[in-house]
């Protein structure tokens, strides 16, 4: 398993993961709260690749992707964060191919994100997820992230989202 910055040649693989997740959402086998054609889309991935902040997980093939940057979502401004934003790093749109679910790839991607943030001296970590995404919420809590707020919003064009805002500080967190 390896992680690397995504490049334009990865776009089809990332889009396929998005499509597979949308199909799983539509058939009821996965709950993300995402909507096909609204978010995430090929354009979502393309824009992130062009910005240089999209990363992929490869294990024989591309099985996951995520955006890692310092871009704060608008709804973050009203949350009761414990840590300031000068040294913040945000994980956006973490996806693992549905056929690879349950094999530890999500946990590994979060570990990669934390290591990347540490190497870039960005110890304040933030993640958001749809409140309907119970699997993501459970994973993030298990990895030491604290739910700071649930904010009703229209998120990336999807109305009626209860966005869960999570935080972790690498300097403050000590595993049990």
Positions of PLM-derived features:
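Conserved beta-hairpin
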Residues: 51-66
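Conserved acyl-donor/pantetheine-binding loop and adjacent beta-alpha core of acyl/acetyltransferases
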Residues: 67-93, 101, 154-159
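Conserved GNAT acetyl-CoA-binding A-motif
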Residues: 110, 117-128
